[in-house]
Amino acid sequence: MKSTFAVLLLAVALAAPAASAAQPNIILIYSDDHGYADLAAQKADPDIRTPHLDAMARDGVRFVRGYVTAPQCVPSRAGVITGRYQQRFGVEDNLKGPLPLAEITIAERLKPAGYVSAQVGKWHLEPTPRSEEQAPAANAHAFLPGAQGFDEYWCGPMNTFMASHDLQGRPLSNPPQRLTDPRFRCVWQTDAALSFIDRHAREPFFLYLAYFTPHVPLQSPEPWFARTPAHLPLERRQALAMIAAMDEGIGQIRARLRALGLEKNTLVFFIGDNGAPLKQGAWNGSLNTPLTGEKGMLTDGGIRTPFLAEWPGTLPAGKVYEPPVISLDVAATAAALAGLPPDPALEGVNLIPFVRGEKSGAPHDLLYWRWRSQAAVRDARWKLILLGKEEKFLFDLESPEGETKNRLADFPAVAADLEKKLMGWNATLPPPGLPRELNAQDQIFYDDHVLQTGVKATKRTAGDRPAAARKKAAATAATTNAAQGWTARNGTLTERDGVLELRTEGGRRAANAFITRTGLALAGPVTLTLRLRTAQPGRLGLAWRTDAQPDFTPENQKFADYAASADWQAITLVAPATGKVIHVRVQFPSADSIDLRQIELHGAAATSNK
């Protein structure tokens, strides 16, 4: 299929004139696990500093409702680089790679129009040990960017990467070659991008720069780390430092374009690949404020990210664009600007005439998602989320409550209409239809979302649920009652002879177990006391949020170390909260199991929850 497509494009290229000087260069910068709040221009968090990205927003367009196609790395990247919903070719989640070689990337699409292309940084579209079912990990080299139309590449997230050229742009013999650079990841990735721009300044180019930031492992790169606010938790400071390093690299790229006289002939996109992940353990560096949910969810916190475009002299400076757009639009925009004929396989739209006011209305009537056991659709106002066959959520995105109030019971006709449209879209996908069986991790995500926001899930009687769901619900209710309102996440909590045993789930990287309580009303400061025993030493963390905070923040955490002991140990932590504490988490490391008892919370006004 791919060879036929390539021959057709070659025929078009041979019949077409040489590449026009009017063809703009196109740069796509993709960040990693970069929450909506962590762009200072969003004005969502006072601690973030992104002067160069802010300059992009000032000199270009900030899309405040910019979406990606999935709340996870691999499918999001597959969607943006092809311009097609990744479900059409089977890359639905991180376990479903690699990107099929038959799929046409932006680089391959632009090549017949005279473009030279490069990929830098995280690729994540090759086979891995987790995708053995689709392609052997040992065959990863056959799926690197060079096999997908990129003329040059430096492919890898960290300090070791596969490359076609060295960082000075000299071709390597028998590529790909494995290279190592000891500097912080963003630094060498920026250098590779600058080298490519310098050497191809006189021909149209496409650069896909995928910074591996601020994704874990969190690091403390200097000099950026020293500039972060010292009062913040370590993980937050590390994320801010990593974002600052990326931001500085983007500033170098913008400066190089100006120095080469290319800024008015270069369209630059900046997009985050998905929302920030769960803010506990090593994953709490970035923030999604004020959005709800996180990476792994189809609420806006998982799929609505920083989204900018800059093209001086063509795009209006300082424009804040309100209608929803999606990462699929990058490929369609690039193809149109390259002068290629319209291709119905592309599922995005050319954004330029909409942003310039040459086309009226919104670029999209509807946007769709299907990921794991979740599916969603949104129009200009409403968003419907289906969680398997178990739950439905209808959100009014134009209301102050947003995704914290389920309007399903209030607007059943709206929900029915959106569900019909979602079903129609899903019928066109392979395999057709909506996911029905509920994924356990998705249940954890949405249970926590319900706990945090108070949003009401679909009202069902016990008899409405399938047998497996009824059994799960009954077990969950029994555990919750026995634990006096404490609920476990990333683990199981059971009671035996007056002792609560927290058993963590193995094999989940950086997702430590925690117990959580919501529905509180404790005046700060709040004191946690508990007794524990365990065969492994560790560090216990207390996180909290008040009624004035829509989500947990890295600042609201306290920690205490404990030893391995067969005896009971008393732990006390004080949350120096001001206001009313409504939700807490008690976090534990990844020990096999921990015994707990006498877990108590006391507020300043002698209120208590045991």
Q: Model-flagged regions — what are they?
A:
Residues 582-588:
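Extracellular beta-strand-rich recognition modules
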Residues 504-577, 588-595:
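Extracellular ligand-binding interfaces
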Residues 466-490, 610:
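Extracellular carbohydrate-recognition regions
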Residues 491-510:
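Short carbohydrate-recognition loop motifs
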Residues 10, 14, 20-388, 392, ...:
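Formylglycine-dependent sulfatase
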